[in-house]
């Protein structure tokens, strides 16, 4: 099993908080269901003592009874998550997570527990993958992504390249390799061109990869090849009509080409999709101002000023 595979889904939180060692499971001599379901209070007490198998049915029941005090239901849900993870019953864990999310959607303690529960579930699933199919493309991909997130660029690149060597036409890997070239700080001056070649290979394999089209558009735009960039942004939008950044990129190119009226529709769409993006409002304001819509332009400049809150924004001359 690749060394970093088990860490892939647990990079931002502490893994293993609810692992099998976190709660001692009391072995039961009786068959399941041979006792009545304990009351919510009794179930909580049993779970706190580590008697998870005895308590789990009562904890589940407590979450469904509206007459049970909210604090007891919350405690039952949290203990239910911990117990079910200790028992490695992932289906029940997800049931408790759903119940907690529905009943206590903004409670910070609940959200904290859910974050760690998802981390634990992700780690266990990654371990399943490494155990069941350690040489699969999926396992190598997960390992590469984990290495990349840790800033271990060279090993990650080798993982992606090994996948491509194994199957040159696998979808998504050329895109990930291209993204890595653009992300690594030590990639050198040829990184953008290496990345561009990978994105071109990706859209040859998978023409519907909107992300690859978008990055190709951005690379062309930064090289001041706006006509080429617009074609790529249009392809990205075709395959992902909610791709706000692609609409913005198209609008920026049209403004650079002084096609101000043509720039307004994609920028309006970008504004609708990402109303909190200051760059969208400033670019739209510029297009409106230079196409003669002074009043609308000033409104957009005003929104931009409010979003940047004192950073200093000026209307173009």
How would you name each of these model-derived features?
Residues 8-20:
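Bacterial N-terminal signal peptides
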Residues 22-71, 75, 309, 315-317:
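N-terminal leader/linker segments that initiate helical-solenoid repeat arrays
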Residues 36, 70, 74, 108, ...:
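Helix-start (N-cap) detector for alpha-helical repeat units in TPR-like alpha-solenoids
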Residues 54, 86-95, 118-128, 151-162, ...:
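Structural signature of tandem alpha-helical TPR/SEL1-like repeats
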Residues 65, 69, 103, 132, ...:
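Structural marker of alpha-solenoid helical repeat scaffolds
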Residues 115-119, 269-312:
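TPR/TPR-like (Sel1-like) alpha-helical repeat modules
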């Amino acid at each position: 099993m690749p060394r970093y595979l088990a860490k892939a889904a647990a990079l931002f939180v502490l893994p293993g908080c609810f692992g099998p060692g976190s709660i001692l499971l009391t072995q039961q001599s009786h068959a399941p269901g041979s006792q009545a379901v304990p009351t919510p209070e009794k179930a909580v007490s049993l779970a706190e003592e580590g008697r998870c198998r005895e308590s789990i049915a009562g904890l589940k029941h407590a979450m469904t009874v509206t007459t049970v005090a909210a604090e007891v239901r919350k405690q039952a849900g949290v203990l239910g998550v911990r117990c079910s993870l200790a028992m490695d019953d992932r289906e029940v864990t997800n049931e408790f997570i759903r119940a907690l999310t529905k009943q206590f959607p903004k409670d910070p303690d609940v959200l904290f527990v859910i974050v760690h529960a998802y981390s634990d579930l992700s780690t266990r699933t990654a371990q399943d993958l490494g155990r069941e199919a350690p040489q699969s493309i999926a396992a190598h991909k997960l390992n590469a992504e984990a290495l990349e997130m840790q800033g271990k660029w060279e090993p990650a690149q080798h993982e992606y390249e090994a996948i491509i060597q194994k199957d040159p036409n696998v979808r998504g890997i050329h895109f990930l390799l291209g993204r890595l070239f653009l992300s690594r700080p030590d990639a050198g001056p040829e990184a953008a061109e290496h990345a561009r070649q990978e994105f071109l290979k990706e859209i040859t394999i998978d023409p519907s990869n909107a992300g690859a089209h978008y990055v190709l558009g951005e690379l062309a735009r930064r090289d001041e090849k706006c006509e080429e960039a617009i074609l790529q942004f249009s392809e990205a939008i075709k395959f992902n009509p909610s791709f706000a950044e692609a609409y913005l990129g198209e609008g920026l190119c049209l403004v650079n080409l002084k096609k101000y009226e043509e720039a307004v529709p994609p920028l309006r769409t970008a504004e609708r999709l990402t109303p909190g993006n200051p760059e969208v409002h400033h670019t739209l304001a510029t297009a409106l101002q230079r196409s003669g819509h002074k009043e609308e332009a000033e409104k957009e400049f005003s929104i931009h000023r409010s979003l940047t809150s004192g950073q200093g924004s000026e209307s173009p001359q």
